[in-house]
Amino acid sequence: MRPFLLGMLALAGIGVVVGAQARDYQPTCRMCPGTFIGKAEMDAYLKRAMANDITDQQVRAVDIGKSHIGVGVVYREKQATPEAVAEHDLVSEVYHIMQGRATLTLGPDLVGKQRRPASQKTVRVQNGPGNGARSITNGLSYDLSPGDVVVIPAGTGHQFAKIDEDISYLMIRFDPDKIVPVKTEAESKADLLGSGVETPDEARAAGARYAHLGNEYAPSCQMCPGYYVPRSEIEAYTKRAIANQLIDQQVRAVNIGRMNVGVGLVHRGRLTAPEANVAEHDLVSEIYHVISGQATLNLGPDLVGKVRRPETMATVRLLNGPGNGATSIRNGVSYELNAGDVVTIPAGTGHQFTKIDDHITYLMVRVDPDKVLPLKSASDSAADLKTDGRASAGGGAGSRVP
């Protein structure tokens, strides 16, 4: 029986033992703030990429307790020939395609591996130690277009076989070994004052300081496949959310070695007064990438009037694990969200929508280092979409088992 179906049976009260949620957990990130990255900042990196022939840039990297999370933006120009294969030993990635079209090949069985030197900026500040390679044996190819999502576990090769139109995508990186440094908002602003390009002398000097990153590391996900979630599938969840008054739906949840990663779709309707409850998740961190709409989101770790969420809730069982509701956030910080903005919410950090102008829809990426939530495969998702979603969704008309 698949893990996702086990979770569904437990939710329905059938005799499945899922005792992990009943424990008293402490947040894995103690008193951590949330992080907001506006679309304007992302666009500034894209503009620099086009001007200075840069492919991959880290915009921010934050500590969420059991992992660092990187948020970057990637720009690749149209090309007819395959790029070299890339593989990262310790850092996993999620792509959310913003524009353009390309064919991406994924697979763990690499041919002609060659160690990436620490003099490469990507090794030092973006995706850590790894290899280049000539090709991927028995790789699977996917045609990417705007709205698609790709999950690439550490150790899995990835190669753009062709790029039909210039492609740009949001990059989310998972770094449980914390091998890549954090990058603050102030450091991002300082970075944008420069060209973003290292001279050969600068690269050699930095490579000498971080020579250990050129060493061999065992991939943290051994022979793991990549995962592709097409925009059409995500839009099917959006359509169902609107039709059935659902809020939070898990589209996929996969094992990437050191953690599980969930990809979800959240749609919230108009809100004229603050939500009644602040949400907080003890073990699962979240990243939002706003697809459409506008809203005001309040973030902060100091919660007032906490009440434990019961394990019977679909959100606890299937979406974001154990945690609390609360009446308010003491000294919270509010952000105005618009399409293209990114938010990171560490485990233990409260979050509350205080206003939604018409609606807000966002891609949800969940980071589950304790693997407390069930996996959800493509076939699980297809089966779920044949239902009305009320048994598996959180919030709205989703499951509220007493």
What do these predicted ranges mean?
Residues 165-181, 358-374:
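A short hydrophobic beta-strand segment most commonly corresponding to one strand
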Residues 142-163, 335-356:
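Conserved metal-binding segment of the jelly-roll/cupin
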